[in-house]
């Protein structure tokens, strides 16, 4: 998946305008900076919603993270403003870009000798067995490269595991304890070794997705692809089918019915709406084809867009769609950010219930507009209600 190295002029002007308005200000309530170091983009965005809520509740400015791309053999850091509009997320809570923070705020507010890492509790180092227990915030990839990229090293650790609820500030007394233990006068920056938010995210933060609007670059690429390739109305589908994912789904236990990754997006909190099965997590090709054909027929779709981490099944889908005389399309080369934006604009979306990548699309479709846009999931059939007359 490719990422351009140059921001569009519109994005650049937007970021600069926002930064200039903030450049001479520092927040007396302090800052929060963190590494979105758990998993790939879907997981990172999932936790980011919780971090936004956490920063807002503590009344600190959030330093917008660099998102992490795992591209063998290197790890790439993608600035937040390259993907999303800074001004829109600032409508939810106070934020500052990583570049603004590191260049103009960090040197004075958070000098090198005061940089401490925050984690739940001390742990043993993985690679250096002789090291004392601690946060070890720069141990391994992507942790080390993430902090190195912004030129941060830590001189000590702070632990918050004794705070009731940890970073769940909804628990009684939690916010007060945070403010008492880590006052902004003594701790102007709370630097977390990982996201201070639960994973998977809870439904109470999903609506925050409406403040994450794609950058003008990504939006224009999505519009351009749709205009050139997708006749409307169109169905968009996300297929999660690489080998690692299949192995994850093999361990699903229907007797315990525990939530897995984003599964609560379709089965409800605690799975009170149903049971997670292997077929929902990793649907068969037959199941996928049947549901695509069903959804195409239900809205009279004129085209289908497919995003996938491995097998887009374009040939199989097109064969199944022959009676409708329409075709499926994909991006070549693939760009996951543009794919997400395209799926968000579809007339109907079919995703993977367990995938946090699919969940980005579902949340956007549920909350970005005045009313939710239709979405469905593979392996889950809509229940037809019987009405007695």
From Swiss-Prot:
**Enzyme class of the recorded protein, top EC level:** transferase
One Gene Ontology cellular component: endoplasmic reticulum
User: What's the short name of a Pfam family annotated to this entry?
Assistant: O-FucT
Identify the residues that bind substrate.
40-43, 238-240, 356-357
Signal peptide range equals 1-21
Also noted in the record is: Manganese is bound to the substrate GDP-fucose, but is not required for enzyme activity.
Q: How does it assemble?
A: Monomer.
Q: What is this protein called?
A: GDP-fucose protein O-fucosyltransferase 1
**Source species:** Caenorhabditis elegans
> What gene is this protein a product of?
pfut-1
